[in-house]
Amino acid sequence: MTMFSTGPRWRSAVADTFALVVYCFVIGMAIEVVISGMTFRQSLSSRLLSIPVNILIAWPYGMYRDAFIRFAQRHAGQRFWARNLADLLAYVSFQSPVYAMILWSVGADFEQMISAVASNAVVSMVMGVAYGYFLEYCRRLFRVAGYV
C-alpha cells in the first residue's frame, strides 16, 4: 500500500458512518418519543432527516472524538475514567448543536427542542460513552487499523 492510499481512510469513514447512523437512529428515536414527548411521526421525520446529516458528520465526528481521546491519553494516560470523560465531552459538544438544528427543521417547538437537547445531553453521560464503545466495535467489525 502506498503512502497516499485512501483505502484505510475510506474504511474508517464507512465504519464511522455506519456506527453513527445506526446508533443515532435508535437512541434518538427513544429519547424523542419516550422522554421529549414528540409524536412518533415527528421523531421518524427527525430520524430520517438525521441520516443524511449523520452521513455528512460521521467521519469528522470520528476524527473529533479521536482528538479528545488522544488529548485524554496524553494528560491522563490509559485511565478508564479519562477515556470515558473524553467520549462524553466529544459526543455532547459535537452532537448537541447538530441535534438542535435537526429538531428545529422538523418543526419541534422551542420547548420540545430544549427538552430533547437537554435530555440528550444528560442521557449522553451514559450514551456518549456507550457510543464510543459502539464506534470502536464497528471499527473492529470493518477492520479499521490504527484508530485510537
From Swiss-Prot:
Underlying gene: alaE
Membrane topology according to the record: Multi-pass membrane protein
Predominant location category: membrane
UniProt keyword terms in alphabetical order: Amino-acid transport, Cell inner membrane, Cell membrane, Membrane, Transmembrane, Transmembrane helix, Transport
GO molecular function: L-amino acid efflux transmembrane transporter activity
Known role: Exports L-alanine.
Segments crossing the lipid bilayer: 18-38, 49-69, 88-108, 114-134
One GO-annotated biological process of the protein: amino acid export across plasma membrane
HAMAP family: L_Ala_exporter
Pfam families for the chain: AlaE (PF06610)
Entry's Gene Ontology cellular component terms: plasma membrane
Native source organism of the sequence: Yersinia pestis
InterPro entries found in the cross-reference section: Ala_export_AlaE
Location within or outside the cell: Cell inner membrane
Membership in a protein family: Belongs to the AlaE exporter family.
Name of the protein this chain belongs to: L-alanine exporter AlaE
